[in-house]
């Protein structure tokens, strides 16, 4: 079973696929800004019969660094990660939101201490727990002078509040 994980994970098939993709996009115009909505982590955890959706959210967060490194390698200047919408802040159970806040805090802190990346929070802070607000502000402050990949962490974002 270990060999199957090797082939399907970071192993042979992954490396072949990655090489093929990189060859196909070589020389093509690349976007300056990539945005990603991180969705499906709860479904992923449920399909694997994991005891809580937090396992899915953590697994998703664990892949973000790899994704951002790939974006940086490709010369993409700005990445926006849509992590938690204002709609979901009102719709999720408090236990799940507590887990998400901790996961987002850990992510923001880790990203702000890696390389020369610049981390910025976008979205409203009014519904966020104070500890998450503090972590997002600290990450932005710590990286404000960095000149590398610009990462927008969209937490508490949504367009409904802006409709008048």
What are the functions of these language-model segments?
Residues 1-164:
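Flexible, compositionally biased loop and terminal segments
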């Amino acid at each position: 079973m270990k060999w199957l994980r090797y082939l399907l994970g970071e192993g042979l098939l992954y490396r072949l696929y990655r090489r093929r993709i990189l060859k196909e996009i070589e020389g093509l115009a690349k976007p300056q800004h990539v945005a990603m909505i991180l969705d499906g982590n709860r479904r992923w955890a449920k399909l694997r019969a994991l005891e809580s959706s937090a396992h899915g959210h953590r697994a998703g967060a664990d892949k973000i660094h790899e994704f951002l490194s790939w974006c940086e390698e490709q010369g993409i200047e700005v990445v926006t990660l849509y992590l938690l919408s204002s709609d979901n802040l009102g719709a999720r159970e408090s236990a799940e939101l507590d887990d998400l806040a901790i996961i987002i805090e850990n992510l923001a802190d880790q990203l702000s201490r890696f390389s020369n990346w610049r981390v910025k929070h976008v979205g409203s802070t009014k519904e966020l727990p104070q500890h998450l607000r503090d972590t997002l502000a600290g990450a932005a402050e710590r990286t404000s002078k960095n000149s590398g990949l610009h990462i927008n962490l969209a937490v508490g974002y949504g367009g409904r509040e802006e409709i008048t």
